[in-house]
Amino acid sequence: MATPVSYSFVQRMVVNELEFLNANVNSNGVGYFSFNHLGDRLQSLLTTLNNVAANADPYLQKCDARSLKLLLDNLNKISFTHNVESKPQLKQRLLDMLPNGDAIGNKYDKELNKILNFTYNCRLDTLNNIEMTHMKLTCVLCYTAGLPFRDNLWYLPNNESGELFATAFGNYLAYFLAMMRSKDGSLDKNVRVMYHVVPPLQLSEPPYIVFRDRINAGLISVQDSAQYQTAGLDFEVCYTLNNKLYLNSPGSQQTELCAEYLELNALPYCLYNATLPDNFALSALNLYKLNDAKKKLKLGNVLFVNTMRTGAKETIIATMRAYYYACKYAKANKLLRVIGNYKGYANDYKLAALDFAILMLVTNSTNIQLKYLTMNVHERMFMELKQQVCRLSPRKIYNVLLNYDIGSEPLTNFSRDAADGAFD
């Protein structure tokens, strides 16, 4: 059974929203999308609080609910700023921002109006297996592109990746509107978001994953990233920087994925949260991914895992366990293959190799395929690392990881002598 999200995490969602409101009122901060937007957000959070009451301290839950109710009952006394643009004005400003805005406006005016008239309010009835429609996410993208909101500064003109996202969002919107017109069947597949909470170490017994008898080398492959195209049942790892669920470092693998899976940029707004705690992973299934070669969107899946900052034993165990719980979920949802990527550690090939080794052990444990994308200059080393790891038993691989020396070469860590000397 999955570990539930803690009530303290829900409280953090509420605090984040109240901090945004405070900045809006007292510091002339970013405004709400409309006059009703604030009330909708607070009411949605109150609903979430009430629905997770079973996982809360009754006294704290009651106090938190009362605080939100007090604000809701006195909205007319709160002097907050909000957007006063009409929808036609907002639509024109959105089209002016896009390289293909004129073409979209001329060809898909009716469909675009439908998106802008869709509700951008997000209600979370549960924090377990959250579902969102593609219409909802596209609506949020359109509004946050023109009206930046908390943790949604993905489309600002001064964003260092601004040109990349302008082109990507323009293409995404054109393809999405065409799919609306043709009533594409994939629109009925909701995006599913799941927090994977790793239980505290004191509640678990080592080893922290289940071992199989041997490593199945046939389930593991290495490929040059430039030659790879994802498949619908792949699970792409997004290497999350600084515990943030939104792009926050130009040129990173996370930013690259956010430009390919545009709907990722709407998740912080919809989840009332932009942070991935150290003991969390997060999966998002049935997202649309840009396929500009075929001028269409295809479904794909993304796994957020925090990047390792060091090769410390505690960090390795945390990463191993985060992957393990996420891969068990992937297996249960019939995803066939995890896609790791050296770009998550593009500036440190030793950490990338460590990530690869952890993924080899975890995917073998959960009986799911692994493809690790690398660059040509390191491809041979990763192939040799695969061979060395696959010669060892899962138990020995686990022991090597617990004794890993990030200062040494990856192949040295998994040499026969090092493996024989490793202990758990």
Swiss-Prot record:
Protein name according to UniProt: Uncharacterized 48.2 kDa protein
